[in-house]
């Protein structure tokens, strides 16, 4: 008599803190931080919402963990003879990470929590690279904030443009149809320059970054 084969049980990936964080980041990347809820996250993971609270007692704890994971993606500075190249790579890496996770900048700027461990490590590494390049403590302080403001400021400035260009690719053309060229010729020229840029073009970021690095190098050299 043939024995009936038992149906194979579905093998689920065990729930873990790392798995919850990855799923939460993917959800926020896709729909923004506003789309994140414990209920929706549990649904995506195929678990009960209450099981998430074993890893994160509050939603704020979850978003703190997400921010920590995001800052952990940022490149730390090397220690080559070229301090500018080392800092440049880190700044570009930080910008790319924040653009990849557009929701993160909102959380960084809300002032709700102390910076995460990964962010503190990144800050310490940048400060240390500036000090090892010969900057005084005071100049390192100002240099770090100039770089940080440029990174975060650029991301905050460019994200709405990326969203608009994706949702309404012909918006600039329609805007320029009725633009008062005679009254505002310089602004019209400026808008045309923007219109010619490719979505996601980062030359603006790198232009400003080079100005900052050039200025810092002059200050460093004059203080030597």
Predicted regions mapped to residue ranges:
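N-terminal intrinsically disordered/low-complexity leader segments
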Residues: 1-15, 185-195, 224
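Amphipathic alpha-helical segments used for helix-helix packing
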Residues: 67, 95-115, 125, 156-160, ...
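Short, basic, alpha-helical segments at the C-terminal edge of helix-turn-helix-like DNA-binding modules
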Residues: 69-73
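C-terminal all-alpha effector/ligand-binding and dimerization domain
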Residues: 197, 201-217
């Amino acid at each position: 008599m043939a024995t009936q084969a038992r149906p194979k049980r579905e093998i689920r990936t065990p729930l873990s803190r790392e798995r919850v964080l990855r799923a939460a980041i993917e959800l926020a990347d896709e729909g923004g931080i506003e789309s994140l809820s414990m209920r929706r996250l549990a649904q995506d993971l195929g678990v009960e919402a209450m099981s998430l609270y074993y890893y994160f007692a509050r939603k704020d704890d979850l978003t703190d963990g997400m921010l920590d994971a995001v800052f952990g993606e940022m490149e730390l500075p090397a220690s080559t003879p070229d301090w500018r190249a080392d800092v440049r790579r880190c700044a570009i890496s930080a910008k790319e990470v924040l653009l990849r996770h557009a929701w993160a900048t909102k959380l960084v700027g809300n002032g709700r929590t102390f910076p995460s461990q990964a962010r503190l490590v990144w800050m310490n590494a940048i400060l240390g690279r500036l000090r090892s390049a010969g900057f005084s403590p005071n100049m390192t302080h100002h240099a770090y904030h100039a770089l940080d403001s440029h990174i975060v400021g650029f991301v905050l400035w460019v994200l709405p443009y990326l969203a608009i260009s994706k949702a309404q690719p012909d918006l600039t053309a329609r805007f320029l149809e009725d633009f008062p060229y005679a009254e505002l010729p310089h602004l019209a020229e400026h808008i045309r320059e923007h219109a010619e840029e490719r979505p996601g073009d980062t030359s603006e970021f790198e232009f400003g970054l080079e100005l900052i690095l050039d200025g810092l190098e002059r200050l460093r050299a004059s203080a030597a």
